[in-house]
Amino acid sequence: MKASMFLALAGLVLLFVVCYASESEEKEFPRELISKIFAVDDFKGEVRECKGFGKSCVPGKNECCSGYACNSRDKWCKVLLGK
């Protein structure tokens, strides 16, 4: 009986701690998001966007994102295998 009461109390305390932590993160989230948006705008002209899976590409131009390669036959980014 004492062990089950202790486990129930410990579970409630753990639930309280998790809820409190997630609530404090939610309050910080808008500020972090805004700061990241403005930081990205500063380097917008310098950063080259890569193309993901299935996007059309030109072989040899290295347009695909990391882990993908432009397939010369189909001319779209595929998963890079074996290298």
Curated annotation (Swiss-Prot):
InterPro entries: Huwentoxin-1 (IPR011696), Huwentoxin_CS1 (IPR013140). GO terms for molecular function: ion channel inhibitor activity; sodium channel regulator activity; toxin activity. Residues 22-48 form a propeptide. It is found in: Secreted. It comes from the Eukaryota. Monomer. Belongs to the neurotoxin 10 (Hwtx-1) family. 14 (Hntx-1) subfamily. The presence of a 'disulfide through disulfide knot' structurally defines this protein as a knottin. Negative results: has no effect on mammalian SCN3A/SCN1B (Nav1.3/beta-1), SCN4A (Nav1.4), SCN5A/SCN1B (Nav1.5/beta-1), and SCN9A/SCN1B (Nav1.7/beta-1). Has also no effect on sodium subtypes in rat DRG neurons containing Nav1.1/SCN1A, Nav1.6/SCN8A, Nav1.7/SCN9A, Nav1.8/SCN10A and Nav1.9/SCN11A. Weakly blocks the rat SCN2A/SCN1B (Nav1.2/beta-1) sodium channel (IC(50)=68 uM) and the insect sodium channel para/tipE (IC(50)=4.3 uM), without altering the activation or inactivation kinetics (depressant toxin). This is Mu-theraphotoxin-Hhn2b 3.
